[in-house]
């Protein structure tokens, strides 16, 4: 723990020194958003020029927005600049910037207008050339909507199975086996918060509604130091914030499941989005085959987010995820009786802010709960009845602080720390009580604390040569 404390102090010193070591240089930073919905745009290209007559020539420098829609261009001198902002599906915008020396940093809020682009047919022929293979894949909602569907509905995991390096265990299961790792070795994050079991029964479907996703990144191997705790891969999901234009919604009805989504403004600077889905297979079984002994099953899930813009430099949001699965026997009159349930509850507070030195800070406070319970009874109507009950309940309180600083035009420093408190309740009983739902003499309560710090630096030397060097240090302690 002493090493972690020393590491956190060292990180603060490094950030402070790097910020102030820029001397008389100036920084342009800010966020790029959709002017209609207010959603931040990820992967927007920004090119910097000093003369409008030289737009056809290479820029003096350039960058792209990160997963928060944020960009920073450091190491600039006093001058007049023209920033060309481009994003596929949006009109190109030119922003004039005058750096006079009065302020060391200039923070912008750039809004782009959507545009439909129509192109004539283009035929390109040529031999395939060698290229660097990256382990990171960005998947947009537009691409997800075009991928094959199951029962007319896009499923996130089934769509990811079409990507190279991603396998599945069977045609029924959607469990992701990436680069030889099992599904539980994929770090799944929703707005920076861990989801322990992001799938429904047997991985037949993910717990995410594809309509609620704003951006998705899949890292299939060699993930950087900012991610940790898993061995195989990283699935980083960002939920949509909702539109600031007007209230709107969509409803989809299916044979065995239906979904609905609603979004809109909550005020001048706030928006919301809520999406839900319900599978009613057990209801159909009762209606059309009530006497069957086939197991009954249903699930539902809810994704939601509230976004509030405090200022041009500060955004706060609350994200939530809830999913519930229930499998049970059709009748208690049979020789066996079972009831199996599991659920996810995720709630997070996310604060993004930019300080005077264009240092991007991201603070995440999360509550995470995953519970699995099962009750199995044999011959409940006889004297030889036997009932077994077990449950596992994992509750986490989690805090994560990230910092990102582009201290040179080709150098980006990322650092931060994680603090987590785990409470794991394991209960088992051979004499299940219908009233108490537990045996006070059976079970374990395990508590643990976990901490980690990381530091990494991304360098872009040329268009073909880049590096990401960093490290991560862990601390873990359990109390039985």
Predicted regions and their residues:
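A beta-strand signature from Gram-negative outer-membrane beta-barrel systems
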Residues: 162-163, 207-248, 259-261, 268
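Structural motif
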Residues: 31-41
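Face-selective signature of the C-terminal outer-membrane beta-barrel domain
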Residues: 307-325, 341-480
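Periplasmic-side early beta-strands and strand-to-turn transitions of outer-membrane beta-barrels
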Residues: 244-245, 265-342, 372
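Short acidic/polar hinge/loop motifs at secondary-structure boundaries
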Residues: 74, 146-148, 193-219
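Extracytoplasmic beta-strand/coil segments of soluble accessory domains associated
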Residues: 148-197, 214
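Short, acidic, small-residue-rich periplasmic hinge/interaction motif at the N-terminus
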Residues: 33, 44-52, 86-90, 100-153, ...
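Short, acidic Ser/Thr/Gly-rich low-complexity loop/linker segments typical of extracellular
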Residues: 52-70
């Amino acid at each position: 723990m002493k090493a972690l404390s020393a590491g956190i102090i060292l990180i603060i010193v490094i950030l402070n020194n790097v910020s102030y070591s820029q001397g008389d240089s100036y920084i342009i930073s800010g966020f790029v958003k959709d002017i209609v919905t207010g959603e931040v745009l990820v992967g927007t290209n920004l090119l910097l020029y000093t003369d409008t007559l030289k737009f056809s020539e290479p820029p003096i420098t350039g960058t792209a927005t990160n997963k928060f829609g944020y960009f920073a261009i450091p190491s600039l001198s006093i001058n007049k600049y023209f920033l060309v902002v481009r994003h596929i599906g949006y009109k190109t915008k030119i922003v004039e910037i005058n750096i006079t020396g009065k302020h060391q940093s200039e923070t912008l809020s750039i809004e782009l207008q959507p545009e439909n682009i129509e192109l004539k047919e283009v035929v390109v022929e040529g031999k395939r050339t060698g290229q660097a293979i990256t382990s990171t894949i960005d998947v947009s909602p537009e691409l997800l909507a075009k991928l094959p569907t199951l029962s007319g509905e896009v499923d996130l995991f089934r769509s990811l199975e079409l990507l190279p390096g991603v396998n599945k265990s069977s045609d029924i299961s959607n469990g992701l086996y990436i680069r030889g790792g099992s599904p539980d070795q994929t770090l799944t994050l929703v707005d920076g918060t861990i989801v322990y079991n992001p799938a429904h029964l047997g991985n037949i479907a993910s717990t995410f509604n594809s309509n609620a996703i704003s951006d998705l990144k899949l890292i299939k191997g060699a993930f950087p130091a900012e991610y940790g705790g898993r061995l195989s891969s990283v699935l980083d999901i960002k939920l949509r914030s909702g539109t600031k234009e007007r209230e709107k919604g969509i409803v989809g009805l299916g044979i065995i499941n239906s979904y609905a989504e609603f979004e809109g403004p909550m005020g001048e600077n706030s928006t919301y989005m809520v999406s839900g889905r319900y599978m009613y297979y057990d209801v159909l079984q009762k209606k059309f085959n009530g006497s069957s002994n086939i197991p009954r099953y249903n699930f539902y899930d809810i994704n939601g987010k509230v976004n509030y813009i405090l200022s041009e430099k500060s955004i706060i949001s609350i994200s939530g995820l809830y999913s519930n699965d229930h499998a049970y026997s059709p009748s208690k009159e049979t020789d066996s009786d079972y009831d199996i349930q599991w659920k996810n509850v995720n709630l997070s507070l996310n604060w993004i802010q930019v300080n005077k030195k264009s240092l991007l800070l991201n603070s995440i406070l999360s509550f995470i709960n995953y519970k699995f319970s099962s009750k199995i009874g044999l011959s409940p109507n006889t004297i030889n009845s036997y009932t077994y009950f077990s449950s596992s309940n994992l509750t986490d309180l989690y805090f994560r602080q990230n910092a990102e600083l582009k201290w040179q035009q080709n150098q980006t420093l990322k650092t931060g720390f994680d603090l987590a408190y785990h409470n794991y309740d394991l209960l088992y009983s051979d004499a299940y009580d219908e009233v108490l739902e537990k045996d006070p003499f059976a079970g374990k309560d395990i508590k643990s604390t976990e901490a980690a710090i990381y530091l990494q630096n991304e360098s872009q030397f040329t268009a073909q040569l880049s590096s990401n060097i960093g490290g991560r240090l862990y601390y873990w302690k359990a109390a039985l």
